[in-house]
Amino acid sequence: MLKSLTRAKFEQLIPTIATGAQYAHYWGKWQNVINRLLVSVVAVVVVLILRLILGESAEALILLLAIITGFYWLWCPIYQASMRNAKARRLQYSGFWRSRIEDVYLTEELIGEEETVNQRGELVIVENRERRINLVLGDETGFYVTIQAPLQRIHKGIKRGQTAELLLLSNRQDLSTVDKVTDAYIPRLNLWIGSYPWLQRDVFLEVSRQLGGSRRSPDNYRYDDRALRRRKYKR
């Protein structure tokens, strides 16, 4: 089932300011926190040097810069998530898509590289890889997308045939071309899955309930006219 949403509802689902889940996503691991702290320390030192150069004439500006740079490590995740949200909100149209899990498979993805020195003093590059779960979601029109997330224990209950609900985003009113998809909700498992928590989840669950909830197979749903049109996903 594909149901178009109003612009107002779309803006509730992907808010301007980062949600708690989005903040946690960009907070990252302890290495990320340390990196941001180092940036804050260096920036504060630069501000103090500017104070010595400019003197008391720029006291108010220096104080403002010191506060901003000193708390960079804290507000940076909010900024990053909000900018990512803003990019998605530039897309004009959205639709609630109730799909079916057509396939589930695992992959290993390269997420970074580190340079280190081995016991012989040689410089070597160590690849950091992460196991990820991939879900192929589709409907009766033949349209499908693949969403991916880091593999976790809670994913072991995911199976083919289960319902998955998410948003399709597009610049075309008929959603015939899909520019972006959000993270997905699997009602049977009460589980969210995706590489980034795009959605305001309480609002999305309310939309899902208004559209009939979901514990049945999508094969039993009555599809609207838009769902019967062929759609194309921009990769």
Protein language model features and the residues they cover:
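N-terminal membrane-targeting/pre-transmembrane regions
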Residues: 1-46
